[in-house]
């Protein structure tokens, strides 16, 4: 996704610093594991595409796998594991994490289509042999990709220099922010980047009659939907709070 490319370019070849946001590694089959394989997770494919039947399969060292039902996510057509864990403070000696689940939707249009997903962070108490899911700490728009037909006549093709589809991309990432003090879960930094092609296109506008210039035929960031937010965990509500509300970027995040 576009955010991953931006992050990789900024990081160069430097090794990632250790911290509470842990990238999972491939385990047995389709499972994703902590680097030491002490905990492995999987969201198996659901039968008949029924996302309401999705479960989180948890395997700890020395314990039998447990299948924990996932909550129903509104409008979800697909459910997948986010390949990252966020480490919190242990509870009674048992590890505590936030596990990410991506719920997705797709739409098809005449001459185009789109997809999008949302990230749900759920509390996971991972005591060996007694794993259980808690509530949702936050839901965030995660990615979106849309292509919309914009030429309906030969005149449109000429006016748009044969760029006959508008393309919209949205990508986000989460990293650990500043020290979280005594908070149960770490403070997080959320960054979103949205782009449009051609650079003048906006999904909420009628772009079909727009006369484009050669300079418009580039992919450009939309500053209204490219932004940063800080997320702080509130133990009283068991929920993350944003430092500012999210802008309305449904042009990018709703297919």
Regions found by a protein language model. Name each.
Residues 2-4, 67, 130, 137:
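Generic N-terminal initiation segments characterized by hydrophobic and/or small/turn-forming residues
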């Amino acid at each position: 996704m576009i955010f991953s490319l931006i992050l990789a370019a900024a990081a160069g070849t430097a090794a990632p610093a250790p911290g509470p946001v842990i990238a999972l590694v491939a385990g047995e089959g389709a499972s994703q594991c902590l680097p030491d394989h002490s905990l492995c997770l999987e969201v198996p494919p659901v039968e008949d595409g029924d996302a309401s039947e999705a479960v989180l399969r948890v395997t700890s060292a020395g314990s039998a796998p447990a299948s924990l039902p996932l909550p129903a996510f509104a409008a979800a057509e697909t459910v997948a594991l986010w390949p990252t864990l966020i480490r919190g403070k242990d509870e009674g000696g048992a590890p505590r994490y936030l596990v990410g689940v991506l719920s997705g939707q797709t739409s098809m249009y005449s001459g185009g289509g789109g997809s999008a997903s949302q990230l749900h962070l759920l509390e996971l108490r991972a005591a060996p042999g007694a794993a259980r899911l808690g509530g949702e700490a936050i839901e965030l728009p995660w990615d979106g990709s849309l292509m919309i037909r914009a030429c309906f006549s030969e005149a449109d093709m000429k006016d748009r220099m044969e760029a006959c589809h508008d393309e919209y991309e949205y990508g986000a990432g989460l990293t650990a922010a500043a020290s979280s003090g005594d908070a149960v879960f770490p403070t997080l930094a959320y960054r979103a980047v949205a782009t449009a092609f051609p650079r003048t296109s906006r999904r909420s506008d009628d772009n079909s009659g727009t006369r484009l210039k050669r300079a418009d035929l580039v992919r450009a960031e939309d500053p209204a939907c490219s932004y940063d937010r800080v997320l702080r965990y509130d133990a009283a509500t068991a929920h993350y709070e944003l430092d500012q509300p999210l802008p309305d970027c449904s042009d990018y995040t709703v297919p």
